[in-house]
Amino acid sequence: MPRKILAVDDEKHIVKLVQVNLERQGYEVITAYDGKEALQKVEAEHPDLVVLDVMMPYMDGFEVLQNLRRNPSTRDIPVIMLTAKAQDADVFKGWQSGVDCYLTKPFNPMELVSFVKRIFKSIEDSGDGGSKIYDVST
């Protein structure tokens, strides 16, 4: 059974770009277009990883991430932030909120794929699906 990834961004062309590139690698990709929808999809679909934008309507990506980290059933889901917010303060806020990887837009889709693969490999290598330390170094 393929790993399931939730791609969340209010820009549909970004979601499509993420979806196409991850599906080419054999992942199942589900989508959401705002923060509230993202939390609903996490509860309903139980993804193995979330690719999350920051600037979205209704609830921003930092709020989504904080909600995921507070919930015992979702706190260990790896989250990759994919955002145009590249200021040091934004990146730091992401790390403080519990993000596992922070990529800025514009992004190279193959770099995203590489980070996804490295996170899943780290989980498999650890033998503990709940591990929160992922080696995504290159």
Put a short name on every predicted segment.
Residues 16-24:
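Charged docking surfaces used in two-component/phosphorelay signaling
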Residues 31-49:
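Acidic, metal-coordinating helix/loop segments flanking the phosphotransfer/catalytic sites
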Residues 56:
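Receiver (REC) domain active-site loop signature in two-component systems and cognate sites
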Residues 107-117:
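C-terminal output helix
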Residues 123-138:
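CheY-like receiver
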